[in-house]
Curated annotation (Swiss-Prot):
Belongs to the universal ribosomal protein uS3 family. Binds the lower part of the 30S subunit head. Binds mRNA in the 70S ribosome, positioning it for translation. PANTHER family: 30S/40S RIBOSOMAL PROTEIN S3, SMALL RIBOSOMAL SUBUNIT PROTEIN US3C. GO terms for biological process: translation. It holds the Pfam family Ribosomal_S3_C. Part of the 30S ribosomal subunit. Forms a tight complex with proteins S10 and S14. One of its GO terms (molecular function) is mRNA binding. SMART domains: KH. Keywords: Ribonucleoprotein, Ribosomal protein, RNA-binding, rRNA-binding. This is Small ribosomal subunit protein uS3. One of its GO terms (cellular component) is cytosolic small ribosomal subunit.
Length: 217
């Protein structure tokens, strides 16, 4: 039975960049655990702020954190109060100077993490899993996606035996490395246990820049 490789991990270094941009030798393990603590803390504090990607860059005793969010106003707060409080908490957590950069996501319906999160929240509110998936697919295709695939797994409708059910529209070429495919998985806590939600979104091809081989001509 064929297994699927992680679509983002497969494309890192080809058309995707790393979410953590730093180099270390002896401190590698410490930095890695610090990164995990930063991500976990931000995801907990900003659970309702539609934060998708968290990028971390490091310099000497300085950490730059870029938050990609569909709700920048909620992250910043009135007069910057929320982001200042978050910065102070991260400074205390890491013992380093943390700089926070906020990047607005212009099209949240083309972000797999946000689409998956939306489906998961609907499932927690007892929306039918088929309806939640089909509505998400329609919104994503209207937003300009070339294709989308969703899958919900677990005790669907409270069934005794867990199963998976998914829907797709358009094309999702997982083997094409130049294909810009966003992938995410989320969990929904329901009265019957956890449901897993997976989302693949194909946003078009990213062609590498053409190299000039004729000496500047």
């Amino acid at each position: 039975m064929g297994q699927k490789v992680h679509p983002i991990g497969m494309r890192v270094g080809i058309i995707r960049d790393w979410d953590a941009k730093w180099y270390a030798e002896k401190e590698y393990a410490d930095y890695l655990h610090e990164d995990l603590a930063i991500r976990k803390f931000i995801q907990k504090e900003l659970a309702d702020a539609a934060v998708s990607t968290i990028e971390i860059e490091r310099a000497v005793n300085k950490v730059n954190v870029s938050l990609h969010t569909a709700k920048p106003g909620m992250v910043i707060g009135k007069g910057g109060a929320n982001v200042d409080a978050l910065r102070a908490q991260l400074n205390k957590l890491t013992g380093k100077q943390v700089h926070i950069n906020i990047v607005e996501i212009k099209s949240p319906d083309l972000d797999a993490h946000l689409v998956g999160e939306n489906i998961a929240r609907q499932l927690e509110q007892r929306v039918a899993f088929r309806r939640a998936q089909k509505q998400a697919i329609q919104r994503t295709m209207r937003a300009g996606a070339k294709g989308i695939k969703t899958q919900v797994s677990g005790r669907l409708n409270g069934a005794d035996i867990a199963r998976s059910e998914g829907y797709s529209e358009g094309t999702v070429p997982l083997h094409t490395l130049r294909a810009d495919i966003d992938y995410a998985w989320e969990e929904a806590d329901t009265t019957y246990g956890k449901l897993g939600v997976k989302v693949w979104i194909y946003r078009g091809e990213i062609l590498p820049a053409r190299k000039n081989t004729k000496g500047g001509k």
